[in-house]
């Protein structure tokens, strides 16, 4: 039986997760806009996971421990960090004590060239000066991150529709048809414009839809269905693979969700350029 939001808040969090919370009694907060996200709160002891979005992990007080998985070689040694960029689709294991910030860099809002170590350290200093009350815009500005929109109007059209209807486009062919491209051509164009395969980008935006439903007071089952998941169990397993904890565990910590406005989609409407593609059947 589906538990209500208030019941979920009363769930006892596992000792492993709670250890980080006890060392950082700051209630977690998530800012979720249409094309970027920020988490500020306890670092927690997360299970290994793969973020769809490139992530900047920032210690607001003491260092955190991080290791990554690669083929061949397996797990790297644990290393102590105060700030680290975790590339998209990188399996990693992070243990943080004390308050942390995680900036999730949606490809549509952030420059793609790598941030230098100097960029990261400047951003770290600005975040620490701002403290725990830093907001979405201020956090991203600390690293000089600027909007990036698809220049191909056909891809921008699909991006807008995914935002409006996150439960749609279960088949890549449907998105390709909206863009007036063949599936193979659409797959290549979307990856080139957005920097992420379509299915993975859609999954990222579905998670944003989950946050919106929960923020509006919906249950996990309602959030799952609104975002196109078959059940709350399906959502829970996917959420844990992406973030290292289940959605119910996150809610049990008393997380606040701020649906900050973000005008990147309207900017994409103006910035995108029509493209002539004579190879639709390619």
Segments and roles (model prediction):
Residues 39-41, 139-147, 187-195:
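Short, Lys/Arg-enriched N-terminal segment that forms or immediately precedes the first helix
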Residues 158-170, 190, 194, 211-219, ...:
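Basic, amphipathic alpha-helical hairpins
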Residues 79-171, 180:
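Compact structured core domains
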């Amino acid at each position: 039986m589906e538990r209500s939001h208030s019941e979920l808040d009363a769930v006892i969090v596992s000792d492993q997760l709670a250890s980080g919370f006890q060392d950082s009694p700051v209630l977690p907060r998530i800012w979720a806009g249409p094309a970027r996200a920020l988490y500020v709160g306890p670092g927690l002891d997360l299970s290994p996971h793969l973020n769809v979005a490139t992530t900047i992990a920032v210690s607001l007080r003491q260092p955190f421990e991080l290791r990554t998985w690669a083929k061949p070689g397996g797990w790297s040694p644990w290393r102590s960090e105060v700030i680290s960029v975790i590339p998209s689709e990188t399996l990693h294991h992070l243990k943080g004590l004390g308050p942390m910030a995680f900036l999730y860099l949606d490809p549509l809002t952030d420059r793609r060239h790598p941030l230098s170590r100097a960029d990261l350290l400047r951003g770290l200093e600005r975040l620490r000066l701002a403290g725990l009350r830093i907001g979405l815009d201020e956090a991203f500005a600390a690293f000089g991150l600027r909007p990036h929109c698809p220049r191909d109007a056909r891809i921008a059209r699909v991006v807008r529709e995914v935002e409006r209807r996150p439960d749609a486009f279960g088949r890549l062919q449907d998105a390709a048809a909206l863009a007036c491209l063949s599936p193979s051509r659409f797959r290549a164009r979307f990856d080139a414009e957005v920097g992420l395969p379509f299915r993975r980008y859609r999954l990222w935006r579905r998670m944003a839809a989950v946050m919106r439903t929960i923020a509006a007071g919906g249950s996990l089952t309602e959030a799952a269905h609104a975002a196109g998941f078959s059940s709350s169990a399906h959502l829970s397993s996917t959420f844990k693979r992406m973030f290292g904890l289940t959605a119910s565990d996150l809610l049990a910590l008393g997380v606040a969700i701020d649906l900050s406005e973000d005008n990147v989609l309207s900017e994409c409407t103006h910035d995108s350029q029509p493209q002539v593609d004579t190879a639709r059947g390619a």
